[in-house]
Amino acid sequence: MLRRSSGTIIAISLLLAVSGCRKAFDQMTPTPSGSIGNSVGMLLRVAEENTQPTLRIVLPGHPTSDRAIEVIFPEHVTVRARGSTDAKQLYLWQPGQYGERPLWRRSERTLEYERNLPGAVHMLARATLEGDGVRFHFRLRNQSDKTYDLIYAPIDPRLTSVFHDVRLERTYVHNANGFDLLASETPSRLRMPLNEWLPVRYLASFTWPIPSRHVERRDGITYYNKARAVDAPFIATLSQDGRWVVASFTHNTGNVWSNPELTCQHVDPQAALSPGEEAILETKLLVVRGSLDDVFKMAMQQRDSLKQ
């Protein structure tokens, strides 16, 4: 599920990584057996039914088969070379038994793999289970002689079960006045037949200019551009009972957005990458039993710790 940015700005970002085996990792297997857990009983595990990198976050007390929080890691890797207006995909995630399975490395709190991509780009992808969620880290190395003005490799957190929010009734962003439903400017969504509401992308600008057209339709998808900018690179979804919050944030981004059919959360950071250089991009997914206020404060306290 790819998103095209509105207006004149095209968001393309790639996340890459340097190679090298790390001594801290004590196991190397095609897929790690079992799961890694944190102090509150949350689990992080590889979804082995997919060859391409997919992780699941399992809430405390839930069965290991639970699929409420699934993260495509990453969804795609896309670059735009200097002097070009066209984006090029170096990688696109596919479900099932498709492509080559990465060689996962596992430590007590971390799952990671490395991959060489077309275009002489090397990626290290690392997921670290912390006490309040998972930090996703991409280290990207440009081994070519090309300069990439934009690199883009978003994770794709997809929420189902108790977090699924197809009409965006529990998915929030934050602006200068506080919390606001991402889709608050489209109350008609609550009455639309689903086949009219979907497929849809709902976007809110952070650093990018707000598009002049608030509703656009491209390639059979309706894009809603929120008229008011957000004041933080943050998006959160409440569970149906309001007891849990899943929130994504990063250090900086152009906009935040969701595809409600998948209830995905995007806060996709991007960077430029010169020949022979590295870039590090990070996103944090908070999974917390608490209030929106609590989770937002946690995100803002941790925001500057995310590399970009």
Tell where the protein language model's regions lie, with residue ranges.
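Acidic (Asp/Glu-rich), glycine- and aromatic
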Residues: 129-130, 134-187
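Extended, loop-rich substrate-binding clefts of extracytoplasmic carbohydrate-active enzymes
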Residues: 81-131, 147, 151, 162
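Bacterial N-terminal signal peptides that target proteins for export
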Residues: 1-10
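Beta-strand-rich N-terminal accessory domains
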Residues: 22-88, 111, 299
